[in-house]
């Protein structure tokens, strides 16, 4: 039931809140990876890898580790392509990548056009399977996220939201700051990030949602060749 709820939220983010129940949405499994696939005859393709668990995946001391890990995966280069090369390759074909976290889930997303689907998928799967996790990019991103957390704490609305959850869900997972606090982020090492990636980014905790002008056969072949 929880998976269905999460899937609904994800697809709603990609298109609209009515998409899940629309005709043409399929659910299937490819080499142990759950796939939710919606075919639409448009040139824009949206892909998102969902990581289940959210705040339940880490301790209070490691708040923000999922945020740091996922963003480093999409914005820190891979073992095959340094950050600048990866960014240049994606910008050249108009493909965008993103990462986000929430109370119950985290995700890595990609949006591309049909003409560059093959190249975009290769970049997407490379970011998921072969993140570089370089110390330099880790330090740069960590400093940025700490600055963001400090700004959130200084903002009345941002700090009020966290305080309300801490009171309502005292000693529960929902009381955690999924973006991290300045203190928790400062205490997360690069080794922590690598270990979190190995522990969390597996088939049991993830599933894929794809919306666009691609066939089940094409998507299945790509998953088997890369993520499977």
Located regions from the model:
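Charge-rich, well-structured scaffold segments of protease-associated domains
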Residues: 1-5, 88-228
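Bacterial N-terminal signal peptides
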Residues: 7-18
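Boundary at the C-terminal end of the N-terminal hydrophobic targeting segment
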Residues: 20-24
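Short, conserved active-site loop motifs that form the nucleotide-linked donor/cofactor pocket
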Residues: 25, 33-35, 206
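N-terminal targeting signals for Sec/Tat export/insertion, comprising classic cleavable signal peptides
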Residues: 29-55
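Solvent-exposed loop/turn segments at secondary-structure junctions
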Residues: 42-43, 55-57, 79, 114-117, ...
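M16/MPP (pitrilysin/insulinase) zinc-metallopeptidase core fold and M16-derived inactive scaffolds
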Residues: 48-111, 177-178
């Amino acid at each position: 039931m929880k998976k269905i709820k999460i899937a609904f939220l994800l697809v709603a983010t990609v298109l609209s809140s009515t998409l899940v129940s629309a005709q043409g949405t399929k659910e299937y499994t490819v080499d142990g990876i759950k796939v939710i696939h919606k075919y639409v005859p448009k040139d824009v393709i949206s892909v998102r890898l969902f990581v289940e668990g959210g705040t339940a995946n880490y301790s209070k001391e490691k708040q923000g580790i999922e945020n740091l890990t996922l963003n480093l995966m999409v914005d820190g280069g891979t073992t095959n392509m340094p950050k600048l090369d990866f960014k240049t390759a994606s910008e050249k074909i108009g493909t965008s990548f993103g990462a986000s976290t929430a109370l119950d889930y985290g995700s890595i997303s990609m949006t591309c056009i049909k003409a560059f689907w093959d190249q975009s998928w290769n970049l997407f799967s490379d970011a998921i399977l072969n993140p570089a996790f370089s110390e330099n990019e880790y330090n740069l991103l960590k400093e940025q996220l700490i600055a963001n957390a400090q700004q959130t704490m200084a903002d009345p609305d941002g700090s009020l939201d966290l305080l309300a959850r801490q009171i309502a869900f005292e000693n529960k997972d929902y009381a955690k700051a999924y973006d991290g606090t300045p203190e928790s982020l400062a205490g997360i090492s690069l080794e922590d990030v690598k270990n979190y990636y190995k522990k969390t980014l597996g088939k049991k905790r993830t599933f894929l949602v794809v919306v666009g002008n691609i066939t089940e056969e094409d998507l299945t072949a790509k998953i088997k060749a890369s993520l499977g």
